[in-house]
Amino acid sequence: MQNVGKNPLFGLACADEEGRGLAIAQAKQISEVARELSDYLGHAAVSKVQVHSAPTRLADANAFRTSLEELKELDWGGATIVVEHCDRFIKEQPPEKGFLSLKEEIDICRTLGLEIHINWGRSAVEGRSAATPYEHILEAGQAGVLAGVFFSGAGSQECAYGYAWIDGHLPAQPDEPSSLMSEEEIARCSKAAIQGGAKYLGAKICVPKDAPLEQRIRMLKTIYNATR
């Protein structure tokens, strides 16, 4: 993501060959590290490697398909590629990521035999609603391409974690009142994900920088307990 911010043409979905080539080169470096780590440990050390349909505003489905075809040919040391869906580009609202739509990513993944990772917060940012992550989970599950779901919050108000609708990995609502990611939403999305074939659930949240270990664990348990 840092490279996307530095170079507006950087991305696996860039129609500009130079920009796409830079992203391919980075992906190859990641595959080499994953392979070397697995070789060193004597078993597959990495299970999934997430990739994204960058760049912002300029993402092209055909370019992304071509990139994924190339990446599938690499040796990932036992890991598999998953596409993490980020907020799609919508002209009427400022993007956080602004990549391809979920439908475009699903179509590509179904063709190539790949799967999609849903990030709760990034889907909420896209739809400006807590309903969007649930809808995305259902859509990916019904298409047979749902790899898993990570619970990362978002909200419509400025808070300690940033401006409104920031992709800021807000905690769940009990720990951050402005977060739309309530325990009820976590529960229904978890159920839908498992029913949709998800292989894993996870959490990705920010915490107060001075939070003691006990508080950090409790904030993660809030999410964990809601998935059960």
Task: Report residues per predicted region.
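Alpha-helix N-cap/loop-to-helix boundary motif
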Residues: 94-101, 124-132
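Short acidic/His/Gly/Ser-rich catalytic and metal-binding motifs that mark active-site loops
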Residues: 3-9, 158-162
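Active-site acidic/histidine proton-transfer and metal-coordination neighborhood
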Residues: 7-112, 214-224
